[in-house]
């Protein structure tokens, strides 16, 4: 069996997204989920699955915004 980098990238994206839900900390969940979503964006652009890329790009933006919001809440305490 030959090594396929594109397929490996898809599996890594899946691993990060699935693993993110194992964290109790919402901060860690969002960081690991963002890594998976970024990998999915790259993977889906390579295989020209643009709806998947769009969804995961949106999720990255949501995760970054929520992490920023959590940081702002902690700074105001």
Swiss-Prot record:
Coiled coil spans: none
GO cellular component terms attached to this protein's record: plasma membrane
Main subcellular localisation: membrane
InterPro entries assigned: Uncharacterised_HI1736/YgjV
Key words of the record: Cell membrane, Membrane, Transmembrane, Transmembrane helix
Compartmental location: Cell membrane
The keyword Cell wall biogenesis/degradation is assigned to this record: no
Pfam families reported in the protein's UniProt record: Imp-YgjV
Signal peptide: none
Protein name: Uncharacterized protein HI_1736
Native organism: Haemophilus influenzae (strain ATCC 51907 / DSM 11121 / KW20 / Rd)
